[in-house]
Amino acid sequence: MLFIQDELYKEYVKMMMNIVILCMILSISLSFWMISITASTYSGTLRPISPWRWLVSLLTPIIIVSHGIKKRSLDSSGALGGLLVGFILTIANYSFFSALLAFFFISSKLTKWRGEVKKCYDSEYKEGGQRNWVQVFCNGGLPAELALLYMIENGPGEIPIDFSKEYTASWMCLSLLGALSCSAGDTWASEIGPVLSKSAPRLITTWEKVPVGTNGGVTPIGLISSLLGGISVGVAYFVTQLVFVDDLEIAAPQWPIVIYGGMAGLLGSLIDSYLGAIMQYSGYDESTGKIVNHPTKDAKFICGKPILDNNAVNLFSSILIALLLPTAAWSFWPRL
């Protein structure tokens, strides 16, 4: 028992160190952006941020986070993290914000959906979801960092994704889209697949049948759900492009955003499942009949090693998709 507690403590310290490093990176990047935007504004290369954009970027995250607290989708620490991430994405690009909004609202609804069923197999199920700051930063930290880099490169504002004219900014836009679509795809798969699937999931590494809720378990319905989750984020991004980007008629087509969003959701879910199968512990607690993510005296081993937790797996999956998606899109994106 002491060994298990010691391992859990080491895992917690490691996770906290990763979160502290992420917060430092965000703070440093935000400082560089403020210096960059100030210098560029005074040198005449960028227009000042309009008061209207400042107002929207401040008020909108507050309204959404307040709603999240009321609906128990966020706890107090998650609300603070959500305010920071929401502000950065909103002031950077309204398309970024709409993609984040689609992910947050739909995922929150799905987390609450059929909660009585999920309690039966998930030992860590929380009523309403109640995402904390760790979950917020593991899902939104990378998009926030990409949004800051986008502002340093391009300044705040919406642009068409066009690799022939704006290569770096377009790369960052698709990278951010990939990260959010990956998170949405994984959430949709984990919230819908176990509930609607009639057959037992299969472990992605061995294709053996495993209990519902096992890390690394996949089902056809779960994979379809992950595709739809990515598409939902892509649609939100695409619609916002149509509304706020002025020069779409002379830019490359934007409809591939929806397709690449779906691809990121599906591929991200597969990567997440693979990492979960080998780097997350899954055991069946015979005393409760639920899947546990840490070794216990009553847990029967199923798969994986207790190296990462679910938040870390989500973060690594998002990073991989954020790197892969724009690289693939650059080769196949339509050009005028």
UniProtKB/Swiss-Prot annotation:
Keyword rRNA-binding attached: no
Q: Which family does it belong to?
A: Belongs to the TMEM19 family.
Q: Which Pfam families match?
A: DUF92 (PF01940)
| Protein name, entry field | Transmembrane protein 19
Membrane topology qualifier: Multi-pass membrane protein
Tell me where it resides.
Membrane
Q: Which UniProt keywords apply?
A: Membrane, Transmembrane, Transmembrane helix
User: What InterPro entries would the database entry show?
Assistant: DUF92_TMEM19 (IPR002794)
Q: Which residues cross the membrane?
A: 19-39, 49-69, 86-106, 218-238, 250-270, 313-333
Name a GO CC annotation attached to this entry.
Answer: membrane
Mainly resides where? membrane
Family annotation (PANTHER family): TRANSMEMBRANE PROTEIN 19
